[in-house]
């Protein structure tokens, strides 16, 4: 029920609360779509000390190029452009082999599935507000592994503490398998 931009604003309020409580170092991260949101956050809002992307997921540009939901994305864009952002769009989402039906406002749908929007990880990485340590952890059995670091990681502003780590895992098990390396990286980055 909330646009991608609105979701990032909610995250921004959380970051502000942590800062106001005296936290000096704040990371933003997540797994799959959460990783996508962490990357988008640094592009749209910024102000965190590091970004952690575990098994990054949701690739609207690639989905659009393959024709997945293309007509619905175009319809949602038209509704938004025509001032009818509240029109409902019904679609079936495919996530890790699971199908689920949704009915959402056109502006919400388009904000998440816009091939050139915040969900486009390569574009968002290239638009980081400033250089921050960026950790990308991907499993050997994740479909995105074939794209390598050039897909989005390399597009972020360079930082000497950024790392691209490959673990022997699938999309779902990457956080568990990579947990020790993530903890070590956080400890390293937090020393600065």
Model-flagged regions — what are they?
Residues 2-21:
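Alpha/beta-hydrolase active-site loop
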Residues 52-62:
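Active-site nucleophile loop of the alpha/beta-hydrolase fold
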Residues 107-126:
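Active-site nucleophile elbow and catalytic-triad environment of alpha/beta-hydrolase enzymes
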Residues 143-149, 174:
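Conserved alpha/beta-hydrolase "acid-adjacent" motif
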């Amino acid at each position: 029920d909330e646009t991608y931009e609105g979701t990032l604003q909610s995250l921004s309020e959380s970051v502000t609360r942590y800062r106001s409580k005296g936290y000096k170092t704040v990371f933003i991260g997540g797994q799959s779509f959460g990783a996508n949101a962490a990357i988008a956050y640094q592009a749209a809002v910024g102000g965190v000390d590091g970004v952690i992307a575990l098994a990054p997921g949701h690739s609207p540009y690639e989905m659009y190029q393959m024709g997945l939901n293309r007509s619905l994305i175009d319809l949602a864009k038209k509704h938004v452009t025509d001032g009818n952002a509240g029109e409902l769009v019904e679609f079936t989402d495919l996530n890790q082999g699971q199908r689920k039906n949704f009915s959402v406002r056109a502006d919400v749908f388009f904000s998440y599935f816009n091939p050139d929007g915040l969900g486009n990880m390569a574009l968002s990485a290239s638009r980081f507000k400033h250089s921050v340590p960026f950790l990308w952890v991907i499993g050997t059995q994740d479909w995105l592994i074939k794209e390598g670091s050039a897909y989005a990681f390399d597009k972020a502003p360079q930082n000497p503490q950024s790392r691209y780590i490959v673990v022997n895992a699938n999309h779902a098990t990457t956080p568990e398998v990579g947990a020790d390396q993530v903890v070590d990286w956080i400890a390293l980055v937090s020393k600065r």
